[in-house]
Amino acid sequence: MRKSALFLLICLINLCSSAVYQNEEHYEPINDGPYVFYVNDSLKARMIENSVLREYYISAENYPDIKTAIHLSCQYKDLLSVYSQKADYRQKYNEVDSIIALSDVHGQYEKYLDILQANGVTDKELNWKFGKGHLVYLGDAFDRGDKVTELLWHLFTLEKQAEKAGGKVHVLLGNHDDMALSGDQRYMNEKYRKVEELTKINYSDLYSGSSVLGKWLRSKPVMITIDDILFVHGGISIDMVRMKLPVKEVNKLFSGKILGKAIAPDNKNIKVELLAGDNGPLWYRGYFEDSTFSENRADSILNFYDSKHIIVGHTTFNNVKVLYNNKIIGIDAGIGYTQPGEVFIYKKGIFYSGSVTGERIKL
């Protein structure tokens, strides 16, 4: 009996030792950041390197020396500028002859870089090379993938580079961006739970209004128009037309009443209730999933917004999806689910899809 008990004890010890060994063998240190905050009239960066939290105080004097260490390539003044940046709710742009749009990258940073380089938006050093063209990012940087921070900082930096070249980067908000800022972690990658543990900061607070990226994201719109093309993450429902919600008001309501906020069940604002719900611009899928949706309804929406085309993400397909002779175009081609993806291209009045090989197909 004693021999049997001793044998079982030895087996148990060996099993535990094996489990510990396997955990050590498969343990992978994480790297993330920086998360830059405005604290007591100065900037403070938090970085995680090999699962060790490091903190840096940033000033105009030391920034040239530490920017490489904190993995930033933007200018010091760019970090500070977000705190004086005012939201542009109108978001109307005219006379643009080159546009590239993509959506729903969800932290798949390498695939995002591959498709931007293949289609002439960035060079091999990841810098802007699209001249006076406009890049539209249609939302959902957050969730699923494990390189959300890298994606956001690249968009942040690219935005500044584009401005200097006479171009423009438009970062629109998606439902997962709003979820992340609101503290909804249902789709968050496990890596960021470890980030929370190491920083001792809730993930949504890493993007609070006192952080550079959080403040920057809170200045971003939900809808924009470029010439006769309307861009929005999910879509525009007929309910928004019936409520007569123009682009400017939608962006203003999201900025002031919805983004990063939990909508109370007893909310009395019917506009906020509509915009934050399934028929709002971040969540709507009716173009592709509502069997009653028709071209006539699409025309009513386009007429109200004085547009001829609506470009959306959110609903995933294998390729760019076209409805009603290019009146509605869905451009979420699965990058967020690790597919190669596609981009939407507008060049001098002609629409194309662009692949990761750089091939263009006329839509």
Model regions: which residues?
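Feature recognizes metal-dependent phosphohydrolase scaffolds
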Residues: 18-363
